[in-house]
């Protein structure tokens, strides 16, 4: 179990293929964060990213901070965000990582 006094992060990389679905997804994320005390640290398009290594595969990226890794996972598995995930999957291809901060 993650230490509750260390923040947790959700990191997203998304290649958008359906902009309308992505817009719908984005409108659902912020309201889903509030009950979990989540806050968006950064949400950017490719123009605001610098690819240092590897092959660019995403045109959107986001980092969301939570009070702990456990709370980040609770949010990710919540019914509200699960609904948003289904729409995100229609929007394109994504990679999501949950990680503990220091």
Segments and roles (model prediction):
Residues 1-77, 100-102:
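Short S/T/G/P-rich N-terminal loop/turn motif that feeds into the first structured element of a domain
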Residues 39-41, 83-85, 95-96:
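A short linear hydrophobic-aromatic micro-motif
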Residues 73-90:
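C-terminal structural segments of small proteins and small subunits
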Residues 89-102:
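C-terminal end-helix/capping segment
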